Swiss-Prot record:
Its main location: endoplasmic reticulum. This is Uncharacterized protein SLP1. It comes from Saccharomyces cerevisiae (strain ATCC 204508 / S288c). Belongs to the SLP1 family. Present with 3250 molecules/cell in log phase SD medium. PROSITE patterns: SUN. The chain crosses the membrane at residues 542-562. Interacts with EMP65. It is found in: Endoplasmic reticulum membrane. May be involved in membrane protein folding. Required for localization of MPS3 to the nuclear envelope. Keywords: Endoplasmic reticulum, Glycoprotein, Membrane, Signal, Transmembrane, Transmembrane helix. The lineage of its organism: Eukaryota, Fungi, Dikarya, Ascomycota, Saccharomycotina.
Length: 587
């Protein structure tokens, strides 16, 4: 019974291994179908089947048949796979719709390039506007009291009328009268005054009372001996200014008055190499009055002003200075002036644009409605016509320089200093104020931010267009690839069905052969088991015999051991008695 159970267990184990191998081959085939690797599937499956179902018996003819069938299937599948790959490559390498490289609407430009393009587009607008040439108007359409202006234009009354013009003149007269009545207490601000925290930084050692020059008092003055080798004074101004005017005075009698002096400025002190910026050398009059000296080229924003006395009138002992005043333009003043100029230029440009934007057709229609009293219009003799028409123009005539100011500003934004042919030095342009630099930076940031927003919008539009084109192209490619994939999959499925049928037949044959081999194997093992049973019974008998012999031997040993112990005890007792006798004898 035990032998039969063992045999049935072996058969069940072999069948489980075979089914597991078949399932593994099927899963491998299903996993590799999508990758078009059918050749690997066929070879792997045949080898796996042959490895799993290999038997001790030789099946050489069957294996050669399997390899031939597999090689034929591999060749056909390789041809189909090559055709599919060629189709896929043709689909992937299809040329996209060509783009015009010069078209900026379809190309991605950098921010700087895009900014240049936009600036050209904006600048082309006024150029087109300025390039228009007006046709001459026929003077026969003028009335009797109308005359021709400097630009061959007449007053049509669309900007001003008589009432408005008279009101404007009256307002201007009233304003001028009020301005004359007003009392002005102080026209300029003295930046070298002690009231606005101006101080004396340095003077020559012989000078006494240098701070008195900052106070408007005739009783206090800077006292300096005329024999001093260097006579100078350094004043720290209230603010950083462009020095435009200096007033200096000596009210003291019986003293020498300064004759020539040098004015220098600086933006910091102490200086590294005493690099003062010289504004000029001036010559004063020999008088006891406040003398003014204009600075035509301020050059830098000055925080410190230095006055050096070079020569004097007369030969008195003391050469005093009673008062020093410094006038100029601060950074905030210059900023406000620039703002006002920009606003005036803007208003003037708006006015000129309004005049230039008049429609010629409207003027011609207006002229047609005007009654003409000239019998024979003579366009060539304009001087006689102007003399006959004695009237005054209602519009204020625009000067030639003012008319072309906007046009010149568009073509010449930066004024360049033209060097004269004489040997005089070129005046240095004053540096810009911090407020002007800040406003320039802010305006640049504002323009850049607005341009950045528009740039991002345009780039997003370009991206959306390009994404749409890419989506359409990928849709076409994907549909083409899907058709090719379906064709290849159907062909591969047909080949796999054929291969599965062949594999099924081969596996059935192999299983039948394996069954026969298993039967032979079980019979052989049954014979071996019978022999083992006989040997086990014989060994059992030998074990029983050896066991009984061992038990007898142990019993014999135990019996003989008891006699030995008794003899040993007797000899031991005799030895002890002999030892006692010997000890007693010794004593």
């Amino acid at each position: 019974m035990a032998n039969r159970l063992l045999i049935y267990g072996l058969i069940l184990w072999v069948s489980i291994i075979g089914s597991f191998a078949l399932d593994r081959n099927k899963t491998a085939q299903n996993a590799k179908i999508g990758l078009h690797d059918t050749t690997v599937i066929t070879t792997g499956s045949t080898t796996n089947v042959q490895k799993e179902h290999s038997s001790p018996l030789s099946t050489g003819s069957l294996r050669t048949h399997d390899f031939r069938q597999a090689s034929k299937v591999d060749i056909r599948q390789a041809d189909i796979r090559e055709n599919g790959e060629r189709k896929e490559q043709d689909a992937l390498t299809q040329p996209a719709t060509p783009r015009n490289p010069g078209d900026s609407s379809n190309s991605f430009l950098s921010f700087d390039e895009w900014k240049k393009v936009k600036s050209k587009e904006h600048s082309s607008g006024p150029e087109r506007h300025l390039s228009r040439v007006r046709e001459p108007v026929d003077p026969s359409c003028y009335k009797e009291k109308e005359c021709i202006g400097e630009e061959l234009e007449i007053d049509l009354g669309f900007l001003t009328n008589k009432n408005e013009w008279s009101e404007r003149e009256e307002n201007q007269k009233g304003f001028n009268e009020e301005k004359d009545i007003e009392k002005v207490y102080k026209k300029k601000f003295n930046y070298a005054s002690l009231d606005c925290a101006a101080t004396i930084v340095k003077s020559n050692p012989e000078a006494i009372g240098a701070t008195s020059t900052l106070i408007e008092s005739k009783d206090k003055y800077l006292l300096n001996p005329c024999s001093a080798p260097q006579q100078f004074i350094v004043i720290e101004l209230c603010e950083d200014i462009l020095v435009e005017e200096i007033e200096i005075a000596n009210y003291e009698f019986f003293s020498s008055t300064f004759k020539r002096f040098r004015v220098s400025v600086s933006d910091r002190i102490p200086m590294v190499k005493n690099e003062w910026t010289i504004l000029g050398e001036f010559e004063a009059r020999n008088s006891r009055e406040l003398q003014k000296f204009q600075i035509h080229n301020p050059q830098i924003w000055a925080s410190y002003l230095k006055i050096e006395i070079l020569s004097h009138y007369e030969d008195e002992f003391y050469c005093p200075i009673s008062l020093i005043k410094v006038y100029g333009k601060s950074m905030m003043d210059e900023f406000k002036i620039d703002q006002l100029k920009a606003q005036e230029d803007k208003e003037q440009s708006i006015g000129t644009n309004n005049i230039n934007n008049l429609n010629e057709q409207n003027i011609q229609d207006r002229c047609n409605n005007i009654e003409t009293r000239l019998e024979t219009p003579n366009t060539s003799n304009l001087s006689d016509l102007a003399g006959a028409l004695s009237c005054t123009s209602k519009l204020i005539p625009l000067k030639f320089d003012e008319f072309f100011k906007v046009l010149n500003a568009s073509f010449c934004p930066s004024k360049q200093m033209i060097s004269s042919s004489s040997s005089s030095a070129v005046p240095v342009i004053p540096e810009e104020s911090i407020f002007k630099n800040i406003m320039k930076r802010l305006s640049q940031l504002e323009t850049n931010s607005s341009l950045t927003v528009s740039y991002i919008e345009e780039q997003s539009k370009l991206l959306s267009k390009s994404f749409e084109q890419l989506e359409m192209a990928h849709e076409a490619k994907f549909s083409h690839l899907v058709t090719i994939f379906n064709e290849t999959m159907m062909s591969n499925l047909d080949l796999l069905n054929n291969f599965a049928n062949q594999l099924k037949d081969q596996s059935l044959r192999i299983l039948e052969e394996q069954k026969l081999e298993n039967d032979k194997f079980t019979n052989r093992h049954l014979l071996h088991l019978e022999r083992l049973e006989k040997e086990v019974s014989f060994q059992r008998r030998i074990v029983y015999a050896s066991f009984f012999a061992f038990v007898g031997l142990i019993s014999y040993l135990l019996i003989t051991r008891e006699l030995y112990f008794e003899d040993f005890e007797e000899s031991k007792n005799g030895a002890i008695e002999k030892a006692d006798i010997v000890q007693q004898a010794i004593r």
